[in-house]
Amino acid sequence: MTNTKINFCGVEFKNPIVTASGTFGFGMEYNEFVSIEEYGGFGAKGLTRVPREGNKPPRIAETPSGILNSVGLQNPGVEHFAKHIMPILAEYDTNVIANMSGNTIEEYCEMAEILSDTDVAIIEMNISCPNVKHGGLTFGTDPKVVNELTSAVKKHSKKPLVVKLSPNVTSITEIAKAAEAGGADGLSLINTLMGMKIDIHTRRPILANNTGGLSGPAVKPVAVRMIHEVHEAVKLPLIGMGGVMNGEDVIEFMLAGASLVALGTGLFVKPDLILPVKQEIKEYMERYNIEDINSIIGTAVMN
């Protein structure tokens, strides 16, 4: 009998497959395609301190092997989630990973307190947000700010805190080390790569916001490389994501160092992607006589 259970930050996941925040709504939207209980856990849509309507359309643009998005964190706000959505999700046999974004350290701390009083299993902190008190620079690009933010939020969180890293940095390992030093329980990566698509007839960007985050298979090699580098640099467990489309992709991320792997853009193509992914992982384990999925984490051998 093979074991696919993963202990991540003290939380047991029945399998290593989760969803990337922003690609799975609040889970219930996918119930007509597949039960959310098929997943070890899922990343809920990103939350902010107050409700947000998001950016003006167009907000999505298809690209070769991926999509660009600038949805702008449209969401009902953390308090609405805590009072009206999480009680419903708590009835499902799966772990909920709440994702939060803030404009100030104080906002992050307030949201951590609110989410800590719910049944979420893990709090994921998106640091790819502008710090309005420091000229709008993104939180996740400065190691000192990442350390300060993580340390502050950790004091207000009763749940394991996972910091979501941006790939749009000079050195992702330095950011990872800063989050670890600040007290993070785990890390997730990668967030989207910044990109642009221009209409050659109008000479204007397709997206109303001009730029957006690139996701999908196009980013997978970058994500795998960054997972490997961060796994070598810190001792924290990792959630890997970026262009996962099948079971082989999941295995590749785990070999690079991820303990959990998130499906994201692939769900827009195949909403029930979790089903063939789980089957392919099972077949891989049987083929190579792997009894425990944990045994392959971070075992890729460099040349």
Residue ranges and their predicted role:
Residues 36, 54-64, 198-212, 254, ...:
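C-terminal helical cap(s) of enzyme catalytic domains, especially alpha/beta-barrels
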Residues 1-96, 102:
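N-terminal capping/small domains of soluble enzymes
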Residues 48-53, 130-132, 194-197, 268-270:
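Short gly/pro/ser/thr-enriched loop/turn and capping motifs at secondary-structure boundaries
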